[in-house]
């Protein structure tokens, strides 16, 4: 069926099956016919997280790490609690790691690589992979151009593993733990981290797609840095950098500003980040998004308290959608297994027009190349695609509705 006929007839024979009562508590604000399938871009925020952000603005709106009045003290206490919670969430030791906040994953990775000095670290090769988001692909490209160090793009295995034998000694490895295209997971993550360190290398992980539903993969994973976004983990818009203290010796500060210094003379300054208890300020020039940081703490608590039934529901939704997409004769699905992230295209159907048609039915999906241009457009030479990414707000009836619509093609 063409899109024109589809848009004319779909309302006549598809009932809205979604039921508010089936939704995970916290998303009651969604209307019955609003189906959000774009969690890989940014997750919806459950009401307790929204309330936490509002509480900051209404109860103790203040500048952190700068003031002596009571509101500021409350902010400082809650921000530090978020830093501690993040390390406990991933079972990492405070003596080894620190937490800094920034804009998003892309900014965090770029901030690290723009400050990184390969000569200090003895790095001779930059390694990334073919299925990386542009945040990794472009920043490693820029680092290579700046330092004239060879950059190698490795192909990931079908299960997401990176071939260890192709990683040279003294390499800087920057890769994702989960793909934002097909949900492929870096299956040999722990072996890779251990191998890179044995070969006198450094490894930085893009965990943007990992933290919300697969954070267990990162627990006690002793990478040199882990970057992710709060807005993909049911928290407000925020970037998070979890950095090994030992990595700092290979960094040259590039951004400077308030909150990073103890004193400033005419031509010199005394950096705060040289103190271990203030080392996080290395990546935090100026005022931070204090309310968003505090609300991130609430999102971690919300995730920790999710009942198993909610997790099972998401797993069931993923498996049901994968079974359909992988078996439909006209749908080309890139996934090799069920995931919370699915990418596909349909024969003779423009994906951008399909996304608009689905939007007419209250179904929100992404279309295009999802910031993975090299892999999708140039390596696989695919047309623009549709991405459906699931979250804890989704229900089985929403999957049924999507399937019923796609069956029309």
Where do the language-model regions lie?
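Pyridoxal 5′-phosphate
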Residues: 1-409
């Amino acid at each position: 069926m063409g899109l024109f006929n589809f848009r004319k007839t779909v309302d006549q024979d598809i009932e809205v099956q979604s039921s508010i009562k089936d939704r995970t508590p916290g998303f009651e604000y969604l209307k019955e016919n609003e189906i959000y399938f774009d969690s890989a871009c940014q997750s919806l925020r459950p009401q307790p997280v929204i309330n936490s952000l509002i509480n900051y603005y209404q109860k103790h709106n203040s500048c952190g790490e700068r003031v002596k009045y009571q509101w500021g003290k409350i902010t400082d206490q809650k921000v530090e609690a978020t830093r501690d919670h993040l390390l406990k969430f991933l079972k990492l030791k405070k003596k080894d790691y620190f937490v800094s906040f920034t804009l998003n994953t892309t900014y965090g990775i770029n901030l690290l690589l723009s400050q990184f000095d390969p000569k200090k670290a003895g790095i001779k090769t930059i390694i990334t992979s073919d299925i990386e988001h542009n945040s990794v692909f472009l920043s490693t490209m820029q680092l290579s151009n700046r330092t004239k160090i060879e950059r190698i793009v490795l192909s990931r295995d079908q299960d997401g593993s990176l071939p260890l034998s192709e990683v040279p000694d003294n390499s800087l490895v920057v890769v994702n733990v989960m793909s934002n295209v097909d949900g492929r997971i870096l299956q040999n993550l722990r072996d890779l981290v251990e191998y890179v360190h044995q070969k006198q290398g450094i490894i930085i992980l893009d965990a943007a797609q990992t933290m919300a539903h697969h954070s267990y993969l990162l627990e006690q994973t002793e990478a040199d840095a882990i970057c992710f976004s709060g807005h993909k983990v049911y928290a407000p818009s925020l970037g998070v950098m979890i950095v090994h203290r030992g990595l700092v010796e290979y960094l040259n500060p590039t951004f400077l500003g308030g909150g990073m210094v103890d004193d400033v003379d005419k031509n010199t300054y005394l950096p705060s980040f040289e103190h271990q208890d203030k080392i996080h300020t290395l990546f935090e020039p100026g005022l931070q998004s204090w309310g968003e940081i505090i609300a991130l703490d609430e999102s971690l608590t919300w995730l920790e308290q999710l009942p198993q039934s909610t997790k099972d529901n998401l797993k069931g939704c993923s498996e049901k959608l994968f079974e359909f997409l992988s078996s439909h004769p006209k749908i080309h699905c890139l996934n090799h297994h069920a995931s919370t992230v699915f990418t596909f295209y349909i024969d003779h159907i423009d994906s951008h027009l399909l996304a608009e048609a689905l939007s007419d039915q209250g179904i929100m999906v992404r279309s295009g190349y999802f910031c993975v241009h090299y892999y999708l457009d140039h390596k696989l030479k695919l047309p623009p695609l549709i991405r459906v990414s699931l979250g804890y707000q989704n229900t089985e009836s929403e999957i049924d509705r999507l399937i019923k619509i796609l069956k029309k093609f």
